[in-house]
């Protein structure tokens, strides 16, 4: 759109153009968008000026996200630019039902800035829709990824601590490439024959750990929704097996299902 005669362009057309910029924006267009913002801010119409202000706010937010993402990539790269680094994380340690799931992800940490995966953070801080969108992008861009699980019966037999370590180990060992380094969230993975560094609050610092957190979360939530189709009385589709009041009352009323962790129900039954 040619904005040289901006005063002659209807507001709705300008808004449609502004919305398109937000949807299709890439950082290479920054200067062009800044010029557009300047023109919008000089318009005599208040609603057009507000479009310019909104576009400027969008650009600032984009730059903040770019900086945050770059910091997460750089955090991993500091271990070695030419290293294959895997991030590994688990989800489902605390639920009363279902498996514990882990994912390991190896990203290309040396891709150009605009080829990086944006908006990645701790999976718990993302909406379900955003997690599912990022899950697809991460899988497409990863050099390798692997998902592993330990089911509820094994958790009962071996205990949650063993199961937690085992699922992380399986996730890493199932990768199609062998990483030079494994970054884990919070604590080290025992009996792993690969160099391992644990990062406190790693899912908010490391791009590799945060990516694995998202893949594990989306995979497990999907599993629990499938289980819910045959066990809808427990509400697995929205509680993911965690001990909500609704879930606890359903266990007391209907008894445990085949996917409940009996060792977690001693105070309920």
Curated annotation (Swiss-Prot):
<keyword id="KW-0540">Nuclease</keyword>
<dbReference type="InterPro" id="IPR022898">
    <property type="entry name" value="RNase_HII"/>
</dbReference>
<keyword id="KW-0378">Hydrolase</keyword>
<dbReference type="InterPro" id="IPR012337">
    <property type="entry name" value="RNaseH-like_sf"/>
</dbReference>
<comment type="function">
    <text>Endonuclease that specifically degrades the RNA of RNA-DNA hybrids.</text>
</comment>
<feature type="binding site">
    <location>
        <position position="89"/>
    </location>
    <ligand>
        <name>a divalent metal cation</name>
    </ligand>
</feature>
<dbReference type="GO" id="GO:0006298">
    <property type="term" value="P:mismatch repair"/>
</dbReference>
<dbReference type="Pfam" id="PF01351">
    <property type="entry name" value="RNase_HII"/>
</dbReference>
<dbReference type="GO" id="GO:0032299">
    <property type="term" value="C:ribonuclease H2 complex"/>
</dbReference>
<dbReference type="GO" id="GO:0030145">
    <property type="term" value="F:manganese ion binding"/>
</dbReference>
<dbReference type="InterPro" id="IPR024567">
    <property type="entry name" value="RNase_HII/HIII_dom"/>
</dbReference>
<dbReference type="GO" id="GO:0043137">
    <property type="term" value="P:DNA replication, removal of RNA primer"/>
</dbReference>
<comment type="similarity">
    <text>Belongs to the RNase HII family.</text>
</comment>
<dbReference type="InterPro" id="IPR036397">
    <property type="entry name" value="RNaseH_sf"/>
</dbReference>
<dbReference type="GO" id="GO:0004523">
    <property type="term" value="F:RNA-DNA hybrid ribonuclease activity"/>
</dbReference>
<feature type="binding site">
    <location>
        <position position="90"/>
    </location>
    <ligand>
        <name>a divalent metal cation</name>
    </ligand>
</feature>
<keyword id="KW-0479">Metal-binding</keyword>
<keyword id="KW-0464">Manganese</keyword>
<feature type="domain" description="RNase H type-2">
    <location>
        <begin position="83"/>
        <end position="269"/>
    </location>
</feature>
<protein>
    <recommendedName>
        <fullName>Ribonuclease HII</fullName>
        <ecNumber>3.1.26.4</ecNumber>
    </recommendedName>
</protein>
<keyword id="KW-0963">Cytoplasm</keyword>
<dbReference type="GO" id="GO:0005737">
    <property type="term" value="C:cytoplasm"/>
</dbReference>
<dbReference type="InterPro" id="IPR001352">
    <property type="entry name" value="RNase_HII/HIII"/>
</dbReference>
<dbReference type="GO" id="GO:0003723">
    <property type="term" value="F:RNA binding"/>
</dbReference>
<feature type="binding site">
    <location>
        <position position="185"/>
    </location>
    <ligand>
        <name>a divalent metal cation</name>
    </ligand>
</feature>
<keyword id="KW-0255">Endonuclease</keyword>
């Amino acid at each position: 759109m040619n904005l040289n005669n901006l005063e002659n362009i209807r507001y709705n057309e300008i808004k449609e153009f502004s919305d398109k910029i937000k949807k299709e924006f890439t950082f290479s267009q920054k200067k062009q968008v800044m010029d557009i913002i300047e023109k919008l801010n000089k318009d005599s119409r208040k609603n057009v000026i507000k479009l310019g202000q909104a576009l400027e706010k969008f650009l600032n937010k984009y730059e903040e996200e770019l900086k945050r993402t770059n910091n997460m990539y750089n955090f991993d790269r500091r271990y070695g630019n030419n290293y294959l680094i895997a991030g590994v994380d688990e989800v489902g340690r605390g639920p009363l039902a279902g498996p514990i799931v882990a994912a390991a992800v190896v990203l290309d940490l040396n891709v150009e800035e605009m080829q990086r995966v944006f908006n990645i953070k701790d999976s718990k801080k993302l909406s379900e829709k955003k997690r599912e969108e990022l899950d697809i992008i991460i899988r497409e861009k990863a050099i390798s990824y692997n998902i592993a699980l330990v089911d509820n019966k094994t958790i009962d037999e071996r205990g949650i601590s063993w199961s937690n370590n085992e699922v992380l180990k399986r996730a890493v060992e199932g990768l199609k490439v062998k990483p030079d380094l494994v970054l884990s969230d919070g604590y080290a993975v025992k009996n792993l024959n690969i160099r391992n560094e644990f990062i406190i609050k790693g899912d908010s610092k490391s791009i590799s750990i945060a990516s694995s957190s998202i893949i594990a979360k989306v995979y497990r939530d999907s599993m629990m929704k499938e289980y819910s189709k045959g066990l809808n009385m427990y509400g697995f589709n929205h509680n993911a097996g965690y001990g909500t009041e609704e879930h606890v009352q359903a266990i007391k009323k209907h008894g445990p299902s085949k996917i409940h962790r009996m060792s977690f129900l001693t105070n309920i039954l």
